[in-house]
Design a protein with these regions (language model features):
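Soluble "head" domains of membrane/secretory-pathway proteins
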Residues: 2-32, 52-58, 63-212
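Hydrophobic membrane-insertion alpha-helices, especially the h-region
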Residues: 37-52
């Protein structure tokens, strides 16, 4: 009996014949679907990467010469600095900012602008410039990367910093920054505020940086 039933089923459901080109058409659809899926994954990873991991920048000015030249392209690691104190930072390759690091950051008075500078002062550091020499906590800072081309117009902030309180606001300084910075001047030094960093361009005569 089982054999007869099997035979009847086979007779009622004969094997479907494949139409010419059907296999090829199905294969084309599969290839297109796989391509679109791969493209979607690539776009998602690219968006994630530029938001959280890396981002490309182009040097717009001479403020970091001769370390970085106008037109140089950078791929910036946005992932390396943690700083939030979250527990997971201990499990990931985060590190704190260090003196000498080159950083890209948003200009405080115009969020659409990005600046490229070098970290000079860390939170709590006592900093001053005397005749263009940087002193940190009373010791001269060795800066083989610093350039003084002398081509820019004379600017007292490029030679001695911070200025005396009576001369603190100059035409070159942002008024908001001058007012804020005045609170951290002690004698002839400025104390870098908590959670803040003092950054300068390597080309000291042509850099709009933390002095301003």
């Amino acid at each position: 009996m089982p054999e007869e039933i099997t035979a009847q089923v086979e007779e009622q459901a004969p094997e479907k014949k494949q139409e010419p080109g059907e296999h090829e058409h199905h294969g084309d659809q599969t290839t297109i679907t796989e391509y679109l899926e791969s493209l979607l994954v690539t776009v998602i990873l690219a968006l994630f990467g530029t938001s959280f991991v890396v981002q490309a920048f182009k040097i717009p000015s001479a403020s970091m010469e001769s370390t970085l030249l106008i037109g140089d392209h950078l791929l910036v690691n946005k992932f390396i600095f943690g700083g939030t104190g979250a527990w997971y930072e201990k499990l990931l390759p985060y590190r704190s900012l260090e003196r000498g690091d080159i950083i890209v950051f948003k200009y405080p008075f115009a969020d659409h602008q990005h600046f490229v500078k070098r970290v000079i002062g860390l939170p709590g550091d006592r900093l001053k410039l005397v005749d263009q020499q940087v002193f940190i906590n009373g010791k001269a800072l060795a800066e083989p990367y610093a350039v003084h081309d002398g081509a820019a117009p004379y600017d007292p902030l490029n030679y001695n910093f911070p200025p005396a309180r009576s001369q603190f606001i100059t035409a070159a300084m942002q008024p908001e920054w001058a007012e804020e910075m005045r609170k951290y001047v002690h004698g002839d030094e400025i104390v870098v505020p908590p959670d803040k960093y003092f950054a300068m361009g390597d080309n000291r005569d042509r850099s709009l940086d933390s002095r301003y």
